[in-house]
Amino acid sequence: MDSGNRGPMPGLSPEAAARFGEGSALVLARWTALQMAVQNGWGGRESRQKADKLASAVLSWFSNDKAPLYIDDLENLLDENMVLSFNTEIEDGSVEEVAEQLMIMHEDCLQGNFELIDQLIN
């Protein structure tokens, strides 16, 4: 029973959770489709807030300790948010790429490895 490490994100130390939050924000900030949607106002006047809500939804998804994390579910979360918030179908493969980056980053953070995040910062 692992009850000793229940911070903001199951399995992640407070430092790892903070670094993952930083890294996930960087991944989403570099996602061209999302940034185009925000810059062009595809979500209306609240496009920036909708992008922020997506970032929060991603962190919440990773915080769910009740079920295993499957990349298909993360892809669906990203895809549905783009459709519902920005009326945008993403068919360039970037949803899958972003989901994969986030899953790898989360796995790395579980192991205390922040190399991917450091690369995004630099």
PLM regions with names:
Residues D73-N122:
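Alpha-helical bundle protein-protein interaction modules that mediate dimerization/oligomerization
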Residues M1-S63:
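Extended alpha-helical interaction segments
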Residues W42-S47, W61-L74, S85-S94:
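Short acidic, glycine/proline-enriched loop segments that cap or flank alpha-helices
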